[in-house]
């Protein structure tokens, strides 16, 4: 549940069709949609078929000079990504831009200070009147203690300047949960994150039950967040999330629609803050292994989205 109590210099934009905030599950379920990859589907087609209202829009990167652009090359406003946002909002939904990802030039690395990074985040927040942002910190960016601390400090500034905004951090994990480096830095610095979201795939799960492996990793995440922040179990669950990968993963793991049902049941019982996946571009059937446009497993179009769209928080 969110509130909009921003300062006078902010530009908040309500979704078309009213100003009532979404239910607890609506913002929590925002599958990744990537305009730079994999024949991106029409968001309204997915919305109409599944009931999902929100998308996590990938990826905001740096153009090389700490300046945010979509994929580091498409314009921040006025291009295909703004068209997508306008389309989703006109249909009664909204978006959560995701900063980072696996590849490309990351703002978190290219910006020279926390202040510059916070200003880059703010530029995107102001451009679209955002209610939430996702920091997808992976690869070399995650591995750098300097970049981790810069990101934490920048997000503290974003929180101070944008009351009510949701801050999600998405990062990799092992089968027993993630390491505690970034979570510990955030807790020690006084940064509260609405959802620490793990990506429980590409972690050696080929030939194993990925639904059960996901739950094991999520329990490890809960324990790490609980320890760092001094939360109760219930508080920790409510500050964590899962971002799965549908179908055949990059490392040959298989995540089925039934695995998504298992994950959904876990999330419902524990009231996770976020339940998402990579990606709606791939939520289409094909055989012979996953690709950027399909899952590689037996399914009907948008089956994975339909499962997570049932999440109510």
Give the positions of each predicted feature.
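Chitinase-like catalytic core of GlcNAc-active glycosidases
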Residues: 23-231, 235-261, 281, 285-311
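Short, low-complexity, polybasic intrinsically disordered segments
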Residues: 256-274
């Amino acid at each position: 549940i969110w509130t909009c109590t921003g300062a006078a210099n902010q530009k908040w934009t309500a979704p078309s069709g009213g100003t009532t905030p979404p239910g607890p599950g609506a913002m929590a379920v925002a599958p990744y949609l990537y305009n730079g990859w994999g024949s991106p589907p029409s968001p309204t087609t997915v919305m109409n078929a599944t009931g999902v209202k929100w998308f996590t829009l990938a990826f905001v990167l740096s153009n090389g000079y700490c300046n945010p652009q979509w994929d580091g090359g498409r314009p921040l406003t006025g291009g295909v990504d703004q068209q997508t946002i306008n389309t989703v909002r006109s249909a009664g939904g909204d978006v959560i831009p995701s900063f980072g990802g696996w590849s490309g030039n990351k703002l978190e690395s290219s910006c020279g200070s926390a202040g510059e990074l916070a200003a880059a985040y703010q530029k995107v927040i102001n451009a679209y009147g955002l209610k939430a942002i996702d920091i997808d910190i992976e690869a070399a960016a995650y591995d750098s203690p300097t970049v981790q601390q810069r990101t934490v400090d920048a997000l503290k500034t974003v929180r101070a300047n944008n009351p009510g905004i949701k801050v999600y951090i998405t990062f990799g994990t092992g089968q027993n949960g993630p390491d505690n480096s970034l979570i510990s830095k955030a807790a020690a610095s006084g940064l509260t994150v609405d959802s620490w979201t793990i990506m429980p795939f590409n972690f050696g799960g080929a030939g194993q039950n990925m639904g059960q492996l996901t739950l094991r990793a999520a329990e490890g995440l809960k324990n790490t967040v609980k320890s760092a922040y001094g939360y109760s179990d219930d508080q920790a669950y409510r500050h964590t999330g899962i971002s799965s990968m549908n179908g055949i993963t990059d490392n040959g793991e298989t995540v089925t629609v039934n695995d998504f049902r298992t994950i959904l049941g876990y999330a419902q019982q524990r009231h996770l803050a976020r339940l998402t996946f990579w990606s709606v571009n791939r939520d289409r059937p094909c055989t012979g292994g996953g690709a950027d446009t399909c899952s590689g497993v037996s399914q009907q179009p948008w089956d994975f989205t339909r499962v997570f769209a049932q999440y109510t928080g």
